[in-house]
Amino acid sequence: MKFSELWLREWVNPAVDSETLSEQITMAGLEVDGVEPVAGAFHGVVVGEVVECGQHPNADKLRVTKVNVGGERLLDIVCGAPNCRQGLKVAVATVGAVLPGDFKIKAAKLRGEPSEGMLCSFSELGISDDHDGIIELPADAPIGTDIRDYLKLDDNAIEISVTPNRADCLGIIGVARDVAVLNQLALNEPTIEPVAATIQDTFPIQVEAPQACPRYLGRVVKGINVKAATPLWMREKLRRCGIRSIDPVVDVTNYVLLELGQPMHAFDLDRLNGSIIVRMAEEGETLTLLDGNEVKLNADTLVIADQQNALAMGGIFGGEHSGVNEETQNVLLECAYFNPLSITGRARRHGLHTDASHRYERGVDPALQHKAIERATRLLIDICGGEAGPVVDITSDADLPTRATITLRREKLDRLIGHVIADEQVSDILQRLGCNVVKTDAGWQATAPSWRFDMEIEEDLVEEVARIYGYNNIPNIPTQAPLIMTSHREASLALKRVKTLLVDHGYQEAITYSFVDPKIQGLIHPNEASLSLPSPISVEMSVMRLSLWSGLLSAAVYNQNRQQSRLRLFESGLRFVPDASADLGIRQDLMLSGVITGTRYEEHWDLARQAVDFYDLKGDLEAVLALTGKLSEVEFKAENNPALHPGQSAAIYLCGERIGFIGVIHPELERKLDLNGRTVVFELLWDKVADRVLPDANEISRFPANRRDIAVVVAENVPAGDILAECKKVGANQLVGVNLFDVYRGKGVAEGYKSLAISLTLQDTTRTLAEEEIAATVAECVAALKQRFQASLRD
């Protein structure tokens, strides 16, 4: 928000300079982004009157004038402005004046005629970019007065960043309140007297959506002159706030917007039909806006309509059909309180952002509307003339926001601030902020003012007290806290340790949004319901993720499109699964996921370029599972997953319970996501592996180990893992190692079969095993494999 420092000082005028005032505003939480003078550096410019104005004898576009600047004689000045005329009050730069850019005014001759000064435009004084003509001052401007004093140009335009919670500061009144409280001064509010109705004309108003519009005020003003000139003082205030003067009706509503923070709108009364109806739009209903653009409305958009058409998007933008124009004589002034939730997001949906929507989305004081409409009525009649009818007020008290009553405990205040502020000072701060305060035994009970939506809980009051007391006044004392040694379960496996392991394996941690694209999620998890957001950031971020794969695969595509072909990413985070049995109907599971793609190794002269495969990621995952001490209990079983390749994927089971998946992305999904090359992913339910098995110390045998190799032929569909598990079960007492070291298909092995070469390592802790014992164990393994899998020894 941008405003004039002098306008602010009309409301409250602390005895501090501009720099200190800006510092106060910043420390109050309204960060000052910039301070700049409202006019250029100049001197020697005064108010003058054009006494004579005639055509230059030697130039068609120049005029020769005689100007009274309050001196002993009239000044001869040559001027080329088309609006120069006799009787006009103007800004005159006399001989010796210095204009912005160090431009010095000297006596000269222009086309043979003497010129003893210059009649100035706004642009020549560094006030604005208006080059259309010289400045036209009011007829009562005192001749000879310094123009800087007359126009109050020794002023600054202050621009502040207003946080969403401080919508009350989107008007001069809100900033002035804070400055008054900080300096312990009274607020000099302008006297706003009710404008008596001089006619009894009203216009019917119906509110069909009271929850969206709890209060709607309308007032008929007839017989206005819309061609009247907006006073210079108002145009200047608007300009210094960054708003261009348009016509007196719009200027008045903009003035009230800036002064009180209350948006208003004026309808051309003669273009309205029947009555004003505040309702929700019909699906697909259209409206042509004031800027000429046509928008198609949704059913959740609030509109102001008459008996025939929608006239405006409520709280956002007016319509062209009912807008005020140069032919307007009668207007209906609108002043309303709209529920912020009924406005939020609607403007953005249509690519709009207006001063009105900016304020209504954040919240407007629901007690302000009567004051605002009286202020606008008085200003409009003073400028344009006309007669006002009575105010029509349609209010649904049940739908208006209630003022929060908050308990502030002395103990909580002292603990959070870390400093004791006297009771009397706390009460004074809260009262000056507009709260109704009652002192209690434990602290205070405060009722928030109507304009402060952000005062809801105890911590809000603590913040307000600290803010007004002054953060700089709170002594710097080191934080003191009792040292409590928390117990640490040795069996707990820190997620940080797993992340470190993955980083050591060449992975990088990714952090992706919990909000994902429903199209991508639908490809990965078809036919699975997900939680949709009622007000998403965008369509591409409108559902909560069912797994981390959506974000990781999108990140992989993003990086591949930027010439990063070799990727190793992992992420830990929550997934959100609809579950009727869970709290609030949603289950949140902490997941650990990873993705790899590209080559197995970084490019190197001594290494072949090989693409990653299933076993690369499986090896990394087994390293993670080894940290838990449960790797021996983990099984990888063939199981269908729509996102994974049916022949290169597996479900991960721990003690018979499925805890995740691993596999190559399905070729069809790879194509739809535009993934480049083979991509392998895994995902684990972290809570299922977060507790590790504590290692047991075992005796190391001092007797020799014996290795025997066997090659068994089994059907193609028999998992090698099942073969190894069966061997371990049979030789549990003396078999200390089972390993698959070769898989063969081809000559000598029938089609549909494969040969698995397995090494069996046997060892005892008490003695050297005899050859007969070794042979017996190997024979038992072969027999068990033959019985369960119809395996046979390969010749």
UniProtKB/Swiss-Prot annotation:
It catalyses: tRNA(Phe) + L-phenylalanine + ATP = L-phenylalanyl-tRNA(Phe) + AMP + diphosphate + H(+). Signal peptide: none annotated. One of its GO terms (biological process) is phenylalanyl-tRNA aminoacylation. It holds the Pfam family B5. Residues 401-476 form the B5 domain. Its cofactor is Mg(2+). Its EC number is 6.1.1.20. One of its GO terms (cellular component) is phenylalanine-tRNA ligase complex. Its main location: cytoplasm. Mg(2+) binds at D454, D460, E463, E464. Coiled coil: none annotated. Keywords: Aminoacyl-tRNA synthetase, ATP-binding, Cytoplasm, Ligase, Magnesium, Metal-binding, Nucleotide-binding, Protein biosynthesis, RNA-binding, tRNA-binding. PROSITE patterns: B5, FDX_ACB, TRBD. InterPro entries: aa-tRNA-synth_II/BPL/LPL (IPR045864), B3/B4_tRNA-bd (IPR005146), DNA-bd_dom_put_sf (IPR009061), Fdx_antiC-bd (IPR005121), Fdx_antiC-bd_sf (IPR036690), NA-bd_OB-fold (IPR012340), Phe-tRNA-ligase_IIc_bsu (IPR045060), Phe-tRNA-ligase_IIc_bsu_bact (IPR004532). The keyword Cytoplasm applies. Belongs to the phenylalanyl-tRNA synthetase beta subunit family. Type 1 subfamily. This is Phenylalanine--tRNA ligase beta subunit. It comes from Pectobacterium atrosepticum (strain SCRI 1043 / ATCC BAA-672) (Erwinia carotovora subsp. atroseptica).
